[in-house]
Structure formats: structure tokens, C-alpha cells
């Protein structure tokens, strides 16, 4: 009887594993295929893309889009500017999020509820990401034992020292989550630069790519009356569009695997437990 139960249990477990594996495989395909499609479309003839001939493999391979993108002298400066803005913005933003989240996790903080309401109001006018603050606060409240804070207080440790010596070393997962969230936000931000920056030499990469795409579209419109000119210009515009997506996405795709372990752990600890 017991052996039959074990056989049934093993059979049900195998069935679950097969179904679960199939579901995860489908999910991976749904997430990864759009990225793959953009990559192969960026090196394929646009007419082949429109005809649906690049479903799995590139067709009539061409690198004209990448040549046009990297031909611009502003690309290198755009990359450096984006890296500078992303690193500086991430460091400042994550530092503010961590300190604010740590303070808000203290139930003894005077006017704690009123301050939280104030922060929620600021969601509508920018500043520190309140969502990130809430996730960080939840992490500090639920993932680090309060006894550690109490022991540090008994030993004479102040709030700042407790935060630096105890809370931060144990907060690597949530730090990774905040770094990824903030880096992606700063890396993809072009509208802020469009509003405030006058010098093109200071444009971030996303704005540089936008300018290149707009110029190529304008060129296609100007060549509309020329025989075959519009078709060729429009073809180049499509290549530039796909190439720009790849060029702008590669740095974040490279960075993510290095923090994936901390990202998953921190996101679950900071969100689900709360």
C-alpha cells in the first residue's frame, strides 16, 4: 500500500514538473523572443521584416543601420553622458531611498504616519521614488531582526552607526533591487534632458538616438519626390530604429545577470513579506 502511494506521489510530482517546466519554457519564450526579434530585425532588410520572413532567422543581412548610428560622432559622447548620469543619479537616489526607508521602518519615529502621507503626496511631483521607499522600509522591517537594533542600542550605537554597521551590510539584496530600478530609470530617461539641456554635447544616449531617428525620418520625407529615394530612405530609417533599440538596451542587458541573484532575493523579501 505504502509503495503504491509512493509510486502515485512520484507520478504526480513528475506530471507537475512537466507542466511547470512547459509553462516556464513558454514564459521564457514570451519574454525573450521580442528581444531576439528586435536583434534579428536590426540586421535584416526591412522589407523582409514586413513580409514576415524574419520570424526565426535574419534575412538579407545588412549592417547599414548600425553603420549609420555609429557614424554619428555624438554616439560616444551620448554613451559617456548616460553612464555619468546613470551612475551619479543611482548613487544619490539609492542613498536617499535607503536612509529614508530605514528611518520609516522605525516605529518610534515621531510623526511617522504623517511623514509617510507627505511622501505619498510627493509621488505626484517627483523626487525620491516613494514606491522604492516603501519596498525598502518593508525590507528593513521584516528581513532584519529587531533584536539586532535593540542589541546595538544597548551597546551604545547611535542611529547612524546602526544603519551603517548593521543595516546596510544585511541589506545587499534590497540595495541590488534599488540599484537596478534606479539605473534603468536613469538610463532610459531622455525627456528630462530634452527639457533642461541646451548643449547637444551633454545629451544622454537615448536623446542622441532619438535625434538620429528624427533626422532620418526627416530625410525620408525630403526624398519623397525622388524616384526610389523615399523607399531607400524609409528602409534606412527602419534599420536605424531597430539598431537604436539594440544599442540602447545592451548595457542594461549586460548589467542585469551580475545582480540577478540579489535582485530576486531582495524583491521577494521587500515586497512579499510586506
What is each model feature region?
Residues 2-274:
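A hydrophobic, multi-pass inner-membrane permease signature
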